[in-house]
Amino acid sequence: MSDSIETKNMGRIVQIIGPVLDIVFAKGQVPNIYNALTIRAKNSAGTEMAVTCEVQQLLGDNCVRAVSMNPTEGLMRGMEVVDTGKPLSVPVGKVTLGRIFNVLGEPVDNMGNVKVEETLPIHRTAPAFVDLDTRLSIFETGIKVVDLLAPYRRGGKIGLFGGAGVGKTVLIMELINNIAKAHGGVSVFAGVGERTREGNDLYTEMKESGVIVEKNLSDSKVALVYGQMNEPPGARMRVALTALTMAEYFRDVNKQDVLFFIDNIFRFVQAGAEVSALLGRMPSAVGYQPTLATEMGGLQERITSTKDGSITSIQAVYVPADDLTDPAPATTFAHLDATTVLSRNLAAKGIYPAVDPLESTSTMLQPWILGEKHYDSAQSVKKTLQRYKELQDIIAILGLDELSEEDRLIVARARKIERFLSQPFFVAEVFTGSPGKYVSLAETIEGFGKIFAGELDDLPEQAFYLVGNITEAISKAASLK
C-alpha cells in the first residue's frame, strides 16, 4: 500500500458491485459505520467524477463495505477514497427555504450555491421521552371526508395508504395546498423514489401559489428534498433522513411548527430492501430486509413533537397489490395517529378523493376530543355506510324493491353520503375543469346533519356529487330540475 494512504485517512477501492463498494484502508484507519467517504477522480473518458458513499459494514482485514449515493459508472478498482471522518451532513436553517436539494444537501434547482451557515449529520437520535409533547388538538384540512371521519392530529403522524393510481399524490398535493398556504410555520417535502415529473409539477405549483418566493427565497415557506426513482438505492434510502434533519432544525433551533410531507414512504422501505440484498443479508418475509422494523422505527421516532415545536407528518404509503397486510404498509401502520385509506372501488366509481370512510381511522375520533356533535355525526355516517355495504348483496340478487321501507331510506341516504364525501380539489382543477373547494369542519357537520334529519331526502343523489358544502348541493339540485 502506498505512502499516501499511510499518511492521510485514505483508502482504495478493491471491489465494485453495482452501487456497493469494498474499500481497503490502512491499519488502524478504518472509518466508522455511517461515515461518509468521497471519491474524486477522472473516469476513462477523462470526465471529473465526484461520488459520495456511506459505510455500512466493516468486513475485517481493514476493509469496509459502503453504499454509493451517486451512480458508480466510471469508477475503477484502485481509485483513492477519502474518509470525511463524519456522517453525511446537510445544510439546515433559513438557507434551505425555497430550494430543492438532493440527498447530499446539494442544490439541484439551477439557482446557484447555497450559503451554508450550519450543517447537521443526517443520523441523529430521537428526542428523549421527557421532551415529548402530548397535547391533543386537531387541525382542519378543508377536505370533508378527512375532517369528519379521520381527523388529523396537530403534531401527529398521518399515513395516506393506497395502491397504484388511486390518488395518493394528488391528495398530498391538495393537503400541501390547503395546509401549507394557511400554515404559519414552514414545510419540508421529501420526494422519496417517486416520479421526477411530479416533483417538477409540485415545484412549479409552489412557485405559482407563492409558497416559494423566487425574488426573495428567505420568504419562502418550504424546503424540498428529492431523490427520484432513477437515483441509486443508497440515495433513495437516505433522502428521507436528509429532509427530516432539515425539519428537526426548524423544530429544535427555530422552535417552529413544521409540516413534513413524505411521498412515498414505501420507496424508503423498497430502497432499504435493495441495499440489504446488495449487502448480502438474508431476506425476511416477502423479500424485505430483516431490519425493516428497525429502519422504519429509526425514521418515525424522530418525526415527533417536543416542547420546543412540532412536526406534523403526512406520509403517502404505496400499498403493493392493494394488500394492506404486506410487511411494508403493516409496519408503517404501527407508527401512525391517523390513516387515510384510498379505495380502488371508489376510484372506479369516480368518487374523488377515493378515501374509504370505513377503513380510514384516527386516534382523534373520540367524543372528549372532538365534541359530541362531531363524534355523533361521524358515527352516523359510518353506521349508515356499513349498513349499505351489508345490504349490497341483497340488492344485487333481489333488487331494491325487496328491501324494507327503512332499509330503502338507508340506501338512499348512504348513496347521497357517498357522493357528498367527494369534493373538487384545487390541484385537480386542470383535469376536472371544476374549481376547487375548501369546506370548513362546521359546514361539513352541518351538511351531514341535514342529510340525517331527512331535509334533503327529495334531492337527486347526483346533486351531491363533487360539490363543496351543502348549500352548493341544494343549488345544484335546483339546476338539475
Swiss-Prot record:
Family: Belongs to the ATPase alpha/beta chains family.
Annotated CDD domains: ATP-synt_F1_beta_C, ATP-synt_F1_beta_N, F1-ATPase_beta_CD
Alphabetical UniProt keywords: ATP synthesis, ATP-binding, CF(1), Chloroplast, Hydrogen ion transport, Ion transport, Membrane, Nucleotide-binding, Plastid, Thylakoid, Translocase, Transport
Subunit (UniProt): F-type ATPases have 2 components, F(1) - the catalytic core - and F(0) - the membrane proton channel. F(1) has five subunits: alpha(3), beta(3), gamma(1), delta(1), epsilon(1). F(0) has four main subunits: a(1), b(1), b'(1) and c(10-14). The alpha and beta chains form an alternating ring which encloses part of the gamma chain. F(1) is attached to F(0) by a central stalk formed by the gamma and epsilon chains, while a peripheral stalk is formed by the delta, b and b' chains.
Misc: In plastids the F-type ATPase is also known as CF(1)CF(0).
Organism annotation: Chlamydomonas reinhardtii (Chlamydomonas smithii)
Transmembrane segments: none
Function: F(1)F(0) ATP synthase produces ATP from ADP in the presence of a proton or sodium gradient. F-type ATPases consist of two structural domains, F(1) containing the extramembraneous catalytic core and F(0) containing the membrane proton channel, linked together by a central stalk and a peripheral stalk. During catalysis, ATP synthesis in the catalytic domain of F(1) is coupled via a rotary mechanism of the central stalk subunits to proton translocation.
Key word Cytoplasm present: no
SUPFAM superfamilies (UniProt xref): C-terminal domain of alpha and beta subunits of F1 ATP synthase, N-terminal domain of alpha and beta subunits of F1 ATP synthase, P-loop containing nucleoside triphosphate hydrolases
Binding site for ATP: 162-169
Protein name: ATP synthase subunit beta, chloroplastic
